[in-house]
Amino acid sequence: MTVKIGVLALQGAVSEHIKALKDSGAETIAVKDASQLEELDGLVLPGGESTTMRRLMDKYGLFDAIKIFAKKKAIFGTCAGLILMAKEIEGRKGPHLGLLDIDVKRNAFGSQVDSFESDLKIDHVAESFDGVFIRAPYIKKVGPGVEILSTYNQHIVACRQGRFLACAFHPELTGDTRFHEYFVKITKENK
């Protein structure tokens, strides 16, 4: 069974996510308009700057459309996408998607110059996976029903809650498609 997964194309490594999804067996498109969501089985919210992405989602009518989409469909957030999916964001008030019962800290590992790579064990994905952290958040706290998939220095950096998957790093920048393959599997199970 083939699934169709969109990548929100407002900011971030859109083409890298599209390539990783295609290499993982999914049909995929760049999503720039809310009407495109209707044809999808899943959606990727890529990295970028979360405040800017939130503003662009509002500007293009995508925020409410994604909240409706999320009621039945799978979503995978990386870095800023994870932040957008969180119920709580440290130091931020106001509406966010609130899809994952998690509390996140933005830029938790430092600024752009503090970006790094680290070998990670990711449950259900890989014993060894190259995590690329760029101004990355981490998950401070998870609620019941949230499965912790990976940690780095005792900080949660990947999780799953039902059909929602999120990570603080950038798997699309590694050339390793195993994390995207896992999302394709989740999307198929949810179809």
From Swiss-Prot:
GO MF annotation list: glutaminase activity; pyridoxal 5'-phosphate synthase (glutamine hydrolysing) activity
Gene3D superfamilies: 3.40.50.880
Record has Hydrolase as a keyword: yes
Keyword terms of this UniProt record: Glutamine amidotransferase, Hydrolase, Lyase, Pyridoxal phosphate
Domain of life from the UniProt record: Bacteria
Residues where L-glutamine binds: 48-50, 106, 134-135
Active-site residues, Swiss-Prot/TrEMBL: 79, 170, 172
PROSITE patterns the record matches: PDXT_SNO_1 (PS01236), PDXT_SNO_2 (PS51130)
GO cellular component, one term: glutaminase complex
GO biological process terms held by the UniProt record: glutamine catabolic process; pyridoxal phosphate biosynthetic process; pyridoxine metabolic process
Pathway connected to this protein: Cofactor biosynthesis; pyridoxal 5'-phosphate biosynthesis
Enzyme Commission code: 4.3.3.6, 3.5.1.2
Catalytic activity: aldehydo-D-ribose 5-phosphate + D-glyceraldehyde 3-phosphate + L-glutamine = pyridoxal 5'-phosphate + L-glutamate + phosphate + 3 H2O + H(+); L-glutamine + H2O = L-glutamate + NH4(+)
InterPro entries: Class_I_gatase-like, PdxT/SNO, PdxT/SNO_CS
Similarity annotation: Belongs to the glutaminase PdxT/SNO family.
PANTHER family tied to this protein: PYRIDOXAL 5'-PHOSPHATE SYNTHASE SUBUNIT SNO, PYRIDOXAL 5'-PHOSPHATE SYNTHASE SUBUNIT SNO1-RELATED
Subunit structure: In the presence of PdxS, forms a dodecamer of heterodimers. Only shows activity in the heterodimer.
Role of this protein: Catalyzes the hydrolysis of glutamine to glutamate and ammonia as part of the biosynthesis of pyridoxal 5'-phosphate. The resulting ammonia molecule is channeled to the active site of PdxS.
HAMAP family in alphabetical order: PdxT
Protein's UniProt name: Pyridoxal 5'-phosphate synthase subunit PdxT
